[in-house]
């Protein structure tokens, strides 16, 4: 696709099933993410979020090319390049402008992981993959190392068929998690998830949580997945490791990280979600495991 997306699909607007969301919330698996308890109706019924919604277009873009840099960095691969929220929104707005130039009555809102919208579920309905045992969307070609973006519009479309779940009996992702965060039915206990603890949890890492070297995010269950091992290698230039992030990683490794290094790296990176003191706390917690 000209704008750089590797896949897209369309789903008819409707009401999503809420059983998994209810189970996740009722068990407290959302940890301190209290915002997940709000706007539940909007998460389930897209028309409460976008009243004119008729079609949800889902788009995927792969970052399956920077695993070498991520492997020993302690930073999840998705965070090594530009901030995907900003990059994908620009692409979607460019696409929207193109469509509206041809169809002036085309109305749409675009979303990139920033609203009460269940991106993975809509991507499944759009035929772009299935939900793996680790809760991630798995695409048959690109695996689960993809970013998801959505455009919700007032036009109807030809709709895609859902794919069958192809995880089979594999439990590699479940068995790989050092903290046993992966529960049945693709549900994640955030309290025990390295990604949650190093990003969303603003406090210190609790005792008993093993980071295995990670200081921002985690790729352990993704690396274990057989679909990622055979996924097509593709990485958009936007998501190639930036010099600032590579410098940050070097400074973390040699113990010389300073706030100015962090500030330079966070300007265009997803790591802006954490404060400097939180990253230092994560580094100390990870280091304490090997001391």
Please provide the spans of the model-predicted regions.
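Iron-sulfur cluster-binding cysteine motifs and their immediate structural context
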Residues: 13, 172-195, 201, 211-238
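SIR2/sirtuin NAD+-dependent deacylase catalytic core
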Residues: 169
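Conserved active-site and cofactor/substrate-binding residues in soluble primary-metabolism enzymes
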Residues: 90, 146, 188, 216, ...
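Auxiliary alpha/beta "docking" domains used to position bulky ligands
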Residues: 1-166
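Alpha-helical scaffold domains
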Residues: 207-291
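Generic structural signal for alpha-helix starts
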Residues: 81, 103, 202-208
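A short beta-strand-loop-alpha-helix capping motif that often carries His-Thr
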Residues: 116, 194, 240-244
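Short, charged low-complexity linear segments at domain edges
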Residues: 138-162, 187-207, 259-263
